[in-house]
Curated annotation (Swiss-Prot):
Keywords: Cell membrane, Coiled coil, Lipid metabolism, Membrane, Phosphoprotein, Sphingolipid metabolism. Residues 468-581 form the PH domain. A motif (PXIXIT-like, required for interaction with CNA1 and CNA2, and calcineurin-dependent dephosphorylation) lies at residues 673-678. The keyword Membrane applies. Changing residue 487 to A: In SLM1-PHM1; reduces phosphoinositide binding by 80% and causes mislocalization to the cytoplasm. In SLM1-PHM2; reduces phosphoinositide binding by 95%. Residues 33-147, 157-176, 626-669 are annotated as: Disordered. The gene is SLM1. It comes from Saccharomyces cerevisiae (strain ATCC 204508 / S288c) (Baker's yeast). This is Phosphatidylinositol 4,5-bisphosphate-binding protein SLM1. It comes from the Eukaryota.
Amino acid sequence: MSKNNTMTSAVSDMLSQQQLNLQHLHNLQQHTRSMTSADHANVLQQQQQQQQQQQQQQQQQQQSASFQNGSLTSDINQQSYLNGQPVPSTSNSTFQNNRTLTMNSGGLQGIISNGSPNIDSNTNVTIAVPDPNNNNGKQLQGKNSLTNTSILSRARSSLQRQRLAQQQQQQQDPRSPLVILVPTAAQPTDILAARFSAWRNVIKSVIVYLTEIASIQDEIVRQQLRLSHAVQFPFFSIENQYQPSSQEDKSVQKFFLPLGNGSIQDLPTILNQYHESLASSASKASRELTNDVIPRLEDLRRDLIVKIKEIKSLQSDFKNSCSKELQQTKQAMKQFQESLKDARYSVPKQDPFLTKLALDRQIKKQLQEENFLHEAFDNLETSGAELEKIVVMEIQNSLTIYARLLGQEAQLVFDILISKLDSGFFNVDPQFEWDNFISRDPNFLLPNLPMRTFKEIVYKYQFDPLTYEIKSGFLERRSKFLKSYSKGYYVLTPNFLHEFKTADRKKDLVPVMSLALSECTVTEHSRKNSTSSPNSTGSDAKFVLHAKQNGIIRRGHNWVFKADSYESMMSWFDNLKILTSTSNIQDKYKFITQKLNLNSDGKPKLTNNHTSINKYQLSNANSTMVENDENDDINSNYVGSTVTPKLDNQTNTNTSMSSLPDTNDSELQDQVPNIYIQTPINDFKS
């Protein structure tokens, strides 16, 4: 019962596996119909690979199963192999099974055998048709028919692949005496000679390339020397090579900083050194390639000819009788197996002991011949490896030298050109040359030299009291011959009375007339009219300045001046009287210092609030103070030289004067008049 149960379970497993395989086959067939003919080959190959995997799995399952029922007769004429020697044998195996074997899409899954699974091409397989009365058989027959030609072809190809794989595995078994792992009919010397001939061609190509490189390096030397000669700056110095000789070049050279200061004058030296260094490096590279690298490669190429001849001379070492010895070993193996079979099943014709001794002796002889051949291969391969190692190392050494030379040339660009320019001319400010040129050349101003102002100027006797103006303003002077008056701007200084056309001391610098006070006196002035208003004009605003006789030609003359007010006239009269009557210079200094409120050094004193300055301040660079004719106030505000008052042009007034009143000396006094607004003067009636 247990045996039947085991067999039933095995059959059920096979049936389930068969159904899965049939379903998979059906899906594959549908997929194949839907694909184009171009994709059929690829899909078929993938299906075969999947079928092989499924075939191996099912073989494992079938080999573990044992069938006792059913009728499947297979006459197998199998030629078995014992230790690699084919032994003809005939065996009839009868398998009883009530189920047919399953054929999947890849072919026959496997043949169940109780013996060796190896089946050669002489194996005849007969598959019995299932019993028609068997329902299960009918069902399986409907699902998977053996009449399908594609399935049968796949089965045959699968069996052939299995057989070839097993044979290759046996042939590569190092324990089998019927296998020779060493090639017996090979020609390794010819192959190796051809390989080193190819290496000779490679070396020749490298030699041609390096020869052209050497030629190019020679051309680089010529081109770099041309570039070195093209560096021509006639007014720049080149270190250790060139100095300007002409006076013009030397003068132009002074426009730039000297050599070594990072200026543009360093450029010729850097470029010249760069091109000369490249020319020297290219010349060195050409010499090294021509005299060292290329000759070594040529010697190696000539040596390879000798080595190739030596390799070809070793061809006799590979002549062997391994195939002959292998046949004798097979014959001895066959005799040994037959003697052993006869000793087991029938009357022995030969003693297995003796046949085994003969077999072992033949195997040793075969191995000796095989080892001789093996040593020849080892010797050839070792020598070839060493020779090729030398070839490769020489080529590597040559290309390494070439790469080093190129690297040195590339490094020169950085070391001599880029680094020097980067640390020098590239790194300076664009105005570096200009600033140094301006600072060194005496024909230009320093960039940081400020402009001077007039108030910063100091010179000797700058604040001498004799340089100040005492009073200035508009007066009217009567003509010598006519009774008319002409208006002018008068400036009273310690020594002169000057008449100007205008009050602008920037444009009008030359006086129309100048009267020396040392040659003049003030004689009289008009009396103040008590009945007139404070602002009245006329006979009460006149004074006479008498010019003394100077020699025979020049006679004395009375100059009649008219002011716009009595107070202004008295101020002019008093100042003129003191200045004309004072002959001592010290007294004159004292008067000026007190009147203009000057310090001991001659500078005007500041007021208490430090906001206003005496209007009689120094007149620097021949400029004078500007003051209205009404303004005689000592403490009035100072008017700078840059301010030009807007005054009227010369005004002529027709005024007649019959007589001048006597001068009242008691009315002369130093006073500080007020500032008045100038108004038109009415006609004076005598």
